[in-house]
């Protein structure tokens, strides 16, 4: 008889099917009950009322962060497990993670895994790869696919990045995350843009992506990065911000391109066929490893708290970017320090005059680093 597992997942995955791989893996070893959690609901925790008094061997939270205290009051479980996403929790304060000290945490982001180990949490790391297509063609090198999901990464950024390259069509998929604002193309490229608002099936969208040589990653940060990984699995040339998880897969100029989001410059792209082939082969090799390693997840679900030692990476990537403006090349005048969902502007190298920080679905801007002066919706 299989043990009982309660799987609490983001309701958005009902549409995207991007978490289906994990649910199938869990079902191979457990009797799984699913719960769709909508963090944008006014009272999201009410969904747990239907599970009040129930007992489970394992509780799995995937990409959702409900009220842990209330969860414990309503549901009994022996082994709690949390799959965090870098885009949602990578920039949260250390204090946030205290509530997960009794959890085994399974990370798809190496950057977040390292941080949680430093906090003394029980963290495990595994890198996901989707199944590559059996054969691929290179697509049209003059065509670009871009899905705008967030306000801060719009068609204007695509125009900057491709300024030095020749293209005649941009497919703009305008389905945004909650609380985001669409950006219209400039007059210079408006006649090159075609639009879509949604696809009946995920397969229809992937078929369109496959016909374009270029794929612009849709967000600044990712949890796993399913969208750009599926593009790489089809041999697309992915252009992405130099942030996790994109920079944990993409090596600039080898199997894709990374850019500085705060100081974007046009990327001169040559030998695109080589980039596409490298991307495809990279995912093909990674998928073979994933098929072997994915069963470790089942071992980690009920493992004693402790976690694993960080795995060495071939190429370590910076977790944040620092820009310095100096006088005579020596004396610091202004320093811009950028971390996930945090930016600091410091005068003379130490005096913090401006900081913005994400809390929930808001970004709060602080004067002198501690006086809140403005609040805006983020996603």
Predicted regions and their residues:
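Short hydrophobic beta-strand element within catalytic cores of glycosyltransferases
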Residues: 237-240
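A charged, aromatic-enriched C-terminal amphipathic alpha-helix characteristic of glycosyltransferases
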Residues: 261-318
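Short alpha-helical segment that forms part of, or immediately flanks, the ligand-binding pocket
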Residues: 206, 229-233, 247-248
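Catalytic core of nucleotide-activated saccharide and alditol-phosphate transferases
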Residues: 19, 37, 65-158
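N-terminal pre-catalytic "stem/leader" segment of glycosyltransferase-like enzymes
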Residues: 1-67
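Aromatic "clamp/platform" in nucleotide-sugar-dependent glycosyltransferases that forms part
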Residues: 220
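Conserved catalytic-core segment of nucleotide-activated headgroup transferases in glycan assembly
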Residues: 16, 131-202
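Short acidic/histidine- and often glycine-rich active-site loop of Leloir-type glycosyltransferases
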Residues: 243-253, 257-258
């Amino acid at each position: 008889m299989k043990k009982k597992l309660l799987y609490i997942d983001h309701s958005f995955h009902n549409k995207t099917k991007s978490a289906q791989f994990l649910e199938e893996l869990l079902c191979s070893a457990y009797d799984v009950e699913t719960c769709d959690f909508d963090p944008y609901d006014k009272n999201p925790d009410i969904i747990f009322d239907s599970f009040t008094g129930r007992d489970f061997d394992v509780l799995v939270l995937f990409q959702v962060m409900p009220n842990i205290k209330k969860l414990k009051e309503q549901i009994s479980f022996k082994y709690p497990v949390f799959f965090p996403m870098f885009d949602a929790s990578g920039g949260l304060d250390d204090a946030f993670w205290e509530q997960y000290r009794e959890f085994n945490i399974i990370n798809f982001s190496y950057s977040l895994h390292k941080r949680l180990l430093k906090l003394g949490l029980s963290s495990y790391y595994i890198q996901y790869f989707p199944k590559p297509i059996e054969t691929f063609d290179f697509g049209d090198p003059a065509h670009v696919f871009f899905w705008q999901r967030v306000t801060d990464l719009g068609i204007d950024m695509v125009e900057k990045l491709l300024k030095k390259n020749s293209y005649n069509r941009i497919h703009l998929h305008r389905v945004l995350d909650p609380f985001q604002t669409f950006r219209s193309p400039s007059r210079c490229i408006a006649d090159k843009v075609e639009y879509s608002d949604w696809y009946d099936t995920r397969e229809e969208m992937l078929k369109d992506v496959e016909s374009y040589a270029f794929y612009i990653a849709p967000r600044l940060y990712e949890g796993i990065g399913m969208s750009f990984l599926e593009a790489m699995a089809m041999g697309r040339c992915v252009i992405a911000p130099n942030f996790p998880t994109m920079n944990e897969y993409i090596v600039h100029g080898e199997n894709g391109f990374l850019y500085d989001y705060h100081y974007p410059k046009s990327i001169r792209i040559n030998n695109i066929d080589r980039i596409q082939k490298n991307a495809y082969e990279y995912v093909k090799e990674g998928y073979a490893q994933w098929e072997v390693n994915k069963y470790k997840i089942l071992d980690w679900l009920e493992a004693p708290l402790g976690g694993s030692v960080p795995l060495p990476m071939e190429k370590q990537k910076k977790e944040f970017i620092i820009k310095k403006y100096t006088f005579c090349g020596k004396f610091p005048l202004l320093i811009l320090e950028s971390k996930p969902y945090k930016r600091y502007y410091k005068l003379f190298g130490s005096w913090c005059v401006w900081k913005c920080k994400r809390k929930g679905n808001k970004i709060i801007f602080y004067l002198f680093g501690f006086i809140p002066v403005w609040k805006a919706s983020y996603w």
